[in-house]
Amino acid sequence: MMKLYSLVIIATLAAAAFAATSEEISAAVSEIISQHQEDLERYAKIVERGEEPKKYIRCSKQLGQSCYLNCECCGASAVCEDIKYICKDKVSDNSILDAMGKAWNAVGNSISRYYCSAE
């Protein structure tokens, strides 16, 4: 019986330690969505001006290098940070939110990869 109580207490403490509040989750999700929305907006502005869109090469930048669109960054979950315009793949300091963010980035990157050529 003591083992059962210990197991319940350990499981509860582990769940509490890794639990993320709904505010943290919604903040991380909205940040990820805004990053991919900015890709669409940047590309639309180029097309509106009637300019020939610059040829972006898919997976041409490594983490920490300067970028313009998410599809330039190598890695399934790598994105082009919207403030410094560098490739990064970390979303949050919380490991659960970071894993969720990386999964969401991978989904978004599968869409934004059409902005870059595969050269």
From Swiss-Prot:
What the record says about family reads: Belongs to the neurotoxin 25 family. ICK-8 subfamily.
Q: What is this protein called?
A: Toxin ICK-8
Which cysteine-cysteine pairs are annotated as disulfide bonds in the entry?
59-74, 67-80, 71-116, 73-87
Q: Which organism is it from?
A: Trittame loki (Brush-footed trapdoor spider)
Indicate the secretion signal residues. 1-19
Q: Which UniProt keywords apply?
A: Disulfide bond, Ion channel impairing toxin, Knottin, Secreted, Signal, Toxin
Organism superkingdom: Eukaryota
Q: Which GO terms describe its molecular function?
A: ion channel regulator activity; toxin activity
Report the function annotation for this chain. Answer: Ion channel inhibitor.
Task: Tell where it localizes.
Answer: Secreted
Q: What is known of its domains?
A: The presence of a 'disulfide through disulfide knot' structurally defines this protein as a knottin.
Summary of the tissues where the protein is detected? Expressed by the venom gland.
In the UniProt record, which is one GO cellular component term?
Answer: extracellular region
- Keyword Flavoprotein appears in the UniProt entry: no
Hydrolase as UniProt keyword: no
Q: What is its main location?
A: secreted
